[in-house]
Each structure stands twice: as structure tokens, then as C-alpha cells.
Amino acid sequence: MSEAQGKLLQGEMNMTLNMTIMTSARDAVGKCLATLGGEYDNMLVLTADVDTSSRIQAFKEKYPDRCYNVGIAEQNLMSVSAGLAHEGFRPLAFAFAPFASMRCYEQVRTDICYSKLPVVIIGNGAGYSNGASGCTHCALEDSALMVACNNMTVLEPGDPFQIAKLLEA
């Protein structure tokens, strides 16, 4: 990353992330969502009771009518997101990575992928990063499962700059 990129991440929307201070991937997502919400009136954020860990507070404060917590019900999260996408909304569905892939795999495959619906699924805490929560919260096979779905694109950004660019797209 160049020095200019290291200090500031600036997208076409004037989205700025200060990279001189350590910015986590989750914080980058939260900041980007708050900015993108002003550009896309049909953007909705749905969570499976991971509002705080997903850092969506800024979006939730700016657009409380476009943020929904379905509770610890990942299967429901995916089916609701599919229904909203079918009606013209652009849902972003947040859950812990192992639950965004394994717990609701049938709903993702059947409701979202078969219908080619534009649902963005964001699984946070991939790999061993949620290890303190126990082995059930470690996602080691999530990417392998999701790439097996037809009409699914799996992206794994490596840093906050890549996250911002992916969300802008």
C-alpha cells in the first residue's frame, strides 16, 4: 500500500478511512455503510443479533428505518433478505461467518442463489478470529461451502481499503 493509501482511503464518494490509526475491518464496514446509506435509498442492513460486533451503529443511527435485527436466526435472516431483494431492496445480511454459511446453507442456496437475488452476505469473524467465543464460532470451511453455490460470488478482502472498495461496488 502506498503512503498516500496508508494515510487515507478515499473512494469516489469521498469516503475516508484514517489509516494512520489502526482501522479494523469491522470499523471500515461500519463507516462505509453509513456513507453508502445516503447514496442508496433501497439499501437495508439486516443482522442476526450481531449489531454491535458488526459495527453498524452509525448506519443504524442515520437510517433506523432501514436496519433490522432478526435475532439469532440466520436461516430467517437469509430468507427475509431474499424476500426483500425480490421486492427491489438491496439487503446486506450480517452474521458470524460460520453461521452465515453453515447454519443457513439451504436458505442461501435455495432462496438467494437459485433466484440470482442481489443479497450481500457479510460473515464477520472468519477463521480463528472469534476463537475466544469457542470452536463453534470459528469458520474454517465457510468459503469452501459458499463457492459451491451456483450464482454466488465469494470475495475475501484482506484489509479495510479493499473492504471499502468492495462495498462501493
Where are these regions (language model features)?
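Thiamine diphosphate
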Residues: 2-169
